[in-house]
A protein has these predicted regions:
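Membrane-cytosol interface segments of multi-pass membrane proteins
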Residues: 1-189, 320-367
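Alpha-helical transmembrane segments of multi-pass integral membrane proteins
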Residues: 217, 244-353
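Aromatic-anchored segments of alpha-helical transmembrane domains
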Residues: 16-23, 132-139, 183-196, 245-258, ...
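Short juxtamembrane and helix-loop transition motifs at transmembrane-helix boundaries
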Residues: 86-91, 111-120, 136-146, 197-204, ...
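Internal transmembrane alpha-helix with an interfacial aromatic "cap," most often the third helix
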Residues: 76, 161-164, 169, 217-231
Length: 367
């Protein structure tokens, strides 16, 4: 089964949206929009564009939910393909996942420690040990957002990988619809417990306890199974506009779920799904054009490196350009994201090459 380019494009769009959001949130943290001006057509148009920019920019963190969905999708797809080719040895599977995740994660720590143009907002202390292990959910208030807040995602991801054999077995046994129902039920129950009868630090719901984000991950796994059953039908819905329109219609309702404790149980799943429909719909449009498709697909292929390294850079720069007008920020944003994408790509590609080289040295030579 060949790699789906539109999945890589979607990952590229998602990580760029996340990086842009962190840049925007730092730059505009204390910013105030000018008063609306509806005095004439030109002023009204400018006011509308300004409000739309502000609202859409503030939704960038929803793209993290898109990453969770696409992670479930790609992991299910690759593991199912391996199962069809002769079964799965879970020991080597775990080792492959470990070597895929941890080396680049450690390189991101090294980059944080030695790179210039980095926002270092906390001291480097003994908490870095738990961070290097990925166990940022231990003493969650002190460790989950330590040094680089984006690394919380890694702590959640390793939990999903730990339980993935159980998820995979369940999904294959009960089918996509029942699996999605079970995943949503478990995730919503966990969120209910941590929000209502036994209120805990919100970082557990964010991803410190991965089951709270299982609905998105299960949706991705179910989408992978549905795609295998009927790829043409699913791609028509997701890539040819129908899914984009559906997401656009449902998004306002999803945003209303922020306005209540019980509603908040469902908000991450709802906003992540709507954002996924928008991003994948845009990816479908981009995939019609060869050069942009290759460019965004390349960013998506190496999105892991960009995700792990971008935030301290955009915070550093964002703090220094707060007096720049919005149009100046947007002009600065484009080359900044391009440079960070290239840097993340270089780091991830180099790390993977080094790991593969070291592993090949340990393999016995054929007789």
């Amino acid at each position: 089964m060949k790699r789906l380019l539109w999945i890589d494009i979607s990952k590229g769009l998602a990580i760029l949206f996340v990086a842009y959001f962190h840049f925007f949130a730092t730059y505009f943290q204390h910013g105030v929009l000018p008063p609306p001006d509806w005095s004439n057509l030109a002023a009204g148009t400018l006011t509308t564009l300004r409000l739309a920019w502000f609202k859409i920019s503030g939704l960038g963190f929803h793209a993290v939910g898109v990453f969770i969905i696409l992670s479930g999708w790609t992991l299910m797809q690759s593991t199912a393909r391996r199962a069809e080719n002769g079964g799965i040895a879970w020991g080597p599977w775990y080792w492959a996942r470990f070597m895929r995740l941890y080396p680049m994660y450690w390189v991101a720590h090294l980059v944080y420690l030695v790179s210039p143009f980095i926002a270092r907002l906390e001291p480097v202390d003994d908490r870095i040990i738990l961070s290097l292990l990925g166990l940022r959910f231990i003493d969650i208030e002190m460790n989950f957002m330590y040094l680089n807040a984006a690394w919380w995602y890694f702590a959640m991801l390793i939990q999903f990988y730990l339980i993935f054999p159980l998820l995979f077995w369940t999904a294959r046994r009960v089918g996509p619809w029942w699996f999605l129902f079970i995943g949503c039920a478990a995730g919503f129950l966990a969120r209910y417990v941590l929000l209502v009868p036994w209120p805990q630090n919100g970082l557990w719901v964010l991803g410190g306890f991965a089951i709270c984000r299982l609905p998105e991950f299960a949706l991705g796994m179910s989408l992978a199974m549905w795609h295998k059953q009927s790829p043409a039908r699913q791609e028509w819905f997701l890539l040819r506009g129908a899914g984009f329109v559906a997401g656009l219609i449902l998004y306002p309702a999803a945003l209303q779920l922020y306005h209540g404790l019980y509603e908040y149980i469902f908000v991450d799943f709802a906003t992540g799904t709507c954002c996924m429909l928008e991003i994948v719909g845009i990816a479908g449009f981009i995939s019609l054009f060869d050069s942009p498709a290759k460019l965004f697909g390349l960013v998506g292929l190496y999105s892991y490196g960009l995700y792990l390294t971008h935030q301290p850079y955009v915070i550093w720069l964002g703090l220094r350009i707060r007096e720049v007008p919005v149009w100046g920020f947007l002009l600065i944003c484009i080359p900044t994201l391009a440079v960070l994408s290239a840097w993340g790509m270089l780091l991830e590609k180099g790390t993977n090459a080094l790991v593969n080289k070291l592993l090949s040295l340990k393999r016995p030579a054929p007789a």
